[in-house]
Amino acid sequence: MIRLVLIAILLGALNGAGQDDRVSRLKWMSGCWVRATPRFTMEEQWTVPRAGTMFGIGRTTRRLVSADSVSEHEFTQIHLVNGKLVFSAHPSGQQPADFTESELTDSSVVFSNSQHDFPQNVRYMKGRADSLYAAVDGTVGGSTRRADFRYARTACEK
């Protein structure tokens, strides 16, 4: 009986480890990223994968004459649901939405939700050690739209 319990515990641990490994394939996303222009700064910060999940936060700051102003923010989570990665987005001023993994490689991931208004796809691609590419795309009113974002690695503020 003890042997059966130990085998069950071991199999459960191995199953969980495999799921954690799936999220861990996105470790290259972890860290702090910035995209700056004269008019705005976009920042994303991703935690290191742990316990089958990653958390992210994004902020867009617009440069105004008198001061900077946060115009948008988003809280995100990447986690496992039924063996697939799910990107859960909570953007400011919009309803939360889940996007399910449709493609995963060692250097890119695509999350899709064909029922979402826009975007229907969220993509992250590993660049060089100091860059991260992101894109959102989909169809709006019968027209295809896409927005691409290139981020540079930056030091995480303490």
Which sequence ranges carry the predicted segments?
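N-terminal helix-cap/turn-to-beta initiation motif at the start of protein domains
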Residues: 18-32
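Short, low-complexity Ser/Thr-rich regulatory SLiMs
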Residues: 48, 80, 126-128, 153
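Well-ordered alpha/beta subsegment
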Residues: 106-113, 117-126, 133-138
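A short glycine-rich beta-turn/N-cap micro-motif
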Residues: 50, 54, 128-133
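Central antiparallel beta-sheet cores of small beta-barrel/beta-sandwich binding domains
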Residues: 35-115
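Edge beta-strand at a domain terminus
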Residues: 17-19, 106, 131-158
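Sec-dependent N-terminal signal peptides
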Residues: 4-13
